């Protein structure tokens, strides 16, 4: 497999507060997201707006309504990304280590009741992509996949 590159598969996890009654949550408000990235295509206001819209649309598709007043849930998200430069073993005899560069992105979405610091729902998505541009394209879909795991009952 000379010249092939292997990256780990995307990793997704969702945690819920077992004591929370999700049937009572009818409205939400998305707050300003937190982005920590040295990738300009990810760390910018336009991308934050795009991701916020994606999260909002996905929640409405799950039956929640965006609050005009006090919401049942505050939705916060954060993104961190890091460029990784490493090496991988050569693919055959006499082939030395090959450079391997990729970008790791971590998307966290928290849903919290007003006045509470602890989330009732947390989704975490880790995405490894060959470039920051590819991560930029994938993160909104990653957010949709996380919200798809939200159960309102």
Residue ranges and their predicted role:
Residues 66-68:
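Short beta-strand
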Residues 1-3:
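Sec-dependent N-terminal signal peptides
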């Amino acid at each position: 497999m000379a010249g092939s590159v292997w990256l780990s598969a995307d990793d997704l996890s969702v945690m819920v507060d077992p004591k929370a009654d999700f049937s009572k949550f009818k409205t939400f408000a998305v707050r300003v997201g937190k982005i920590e990235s040295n990738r300009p295509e990810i760390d910018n206001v336009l991308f934050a707006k795009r991701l916020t819209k994606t999260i909002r649309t996905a929640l409405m598709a799950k039956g929640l309504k965006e609050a005009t007043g006090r919401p049942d849930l505050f939705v916060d998200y954060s993104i961190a990304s890091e460029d990784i430069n490493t090496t991988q073993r050569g693919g055959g005899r006499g082939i030395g280590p090959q450079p391997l560069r990729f970008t790791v992105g971590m998307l966290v979405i928290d849903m919290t009741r007003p006045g509470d610091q602890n989330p009732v729902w947390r989704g975490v998505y880790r995405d490894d992509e060959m470039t920051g541009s590819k991560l930029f394209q994938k993160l909104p879909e990653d957010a949709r996949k996380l919200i798809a795991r939200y159960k309102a009952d």
